[in-house]
C-alpha cells in the first residue's frame, strides 16, 4: 500500500452514519493484505467506566474523563449503587486527565452543602467568578474517598480540591498533575479548534 498521514487516514475513515468503508490490514509476518468492510456508526465513549460494590457497604465508581455525559452517567451509577445499600463511596479519578468544568461542578455539587465553594476562576484581566454548591445534592452525608495519581489533571484536580478544601472526604494517592486550569474551546470553520487557557 501507499503511506498516508494520520490526518488523511482519519478523514478517509470518517463519513456519513451507516455508510461503509473498506480497510486493508497487513499483519506482521504476512505479505498478504486482509480486507474488511466496516459500517460507520457513532462511537460513544463513556466517562463512567465502572461502578460496583467493593464489599457489602462500599461502592466504587471509576471516571475516565469529564465530558457532556459524565454527570448523567455518574447519577445513574450512584442510583444503581444506592439500590445496593451503599454506605461509603470511592470515586476513582486516577489517570483522568480532566474535561468540562460544568461536568465537574455538577458532580461536586452532589456532595457539598449550600454555598460551599467548588471552584473559582480568575484571569489576569477577568474578575473572579465563584462556582458554589446549591445545597440540592443528594449525597452530602455519604463518607467519601477520592483516588488520584500523577496523571489526574485539570477537572479531576478541581473535584478532588473541592472535596478536600471543604473537608468533605479523604483524598488518597499520589500528587496530581498540577494543571488546575480552565480552558475555553474555540472551533473554526475548517474543523480545527483552539483550547485557550483563560484562568
Give residue ranges: language-model regions.
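Short, intrinsically disordered, charge-balanced linker/junction segments flanking boundaries
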Residues: 196-199
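Cleft-lining beta-strand/loop regions that shape enzyme active-site pockets
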Residues: 1-189
Amino acid at each position: 500500500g501507499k503511506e498516508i498521514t494520520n490526518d488523511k487516514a482519519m478523514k478517509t475513515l470518517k463519513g456519513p452514519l451507516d455508510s461503509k468503508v473498506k480497510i486493508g490490514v497487513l499483519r506482521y509476518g504476512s505479505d498478504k493484505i486482509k480486507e474488511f468492510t466496516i459500517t460507520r456508526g457513532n462511537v460513544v465513549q463513556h466517562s463512567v467506566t465502572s461502578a460496583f460494590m467493593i464489599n457489602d457497604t462500599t461502592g466504587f465508581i471509576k471516571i475516565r474523563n469529564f465530558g457532556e455525559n459524565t454527570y448523567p452517567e455518574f447519577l445513574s451509577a450512584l442510583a444503581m449503587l444506592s439500590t445496593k445499600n451503599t454506605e461509603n463511596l470511592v470515586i476513582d479519578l486516577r489517570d483522568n486527565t480532566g474535561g468540562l468544568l460544568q461536568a465537574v461542578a455538577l458532580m461536586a455539587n452532589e456532595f457539598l452543602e449550600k454555598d460551599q465553594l467548588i471552584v473559582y476562576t480568575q484571569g489576569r484581566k477577568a474578575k473572579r467568578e465563584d462556582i458554589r454548591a446549591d445545597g440540592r445534592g443528594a449525597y452530602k452525608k455519604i463518607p467519601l474517598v477520592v483516588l488520584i495519581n500523577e496523571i489526574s489533571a485539570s477537572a479531576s484536580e478541581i473535584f478532588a480540591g473541592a472535596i478536600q478544601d471543604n473537608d468533605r472526604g479523604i483524598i488518597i494517592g499520589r500528587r496530581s498533575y498540577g494543571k488546575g486550569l480552565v480552558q475555553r474551546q474555540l472551533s473554526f470553520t475548517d474543523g480545527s479548534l483552539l483550547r485557550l487557557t483563560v484562568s
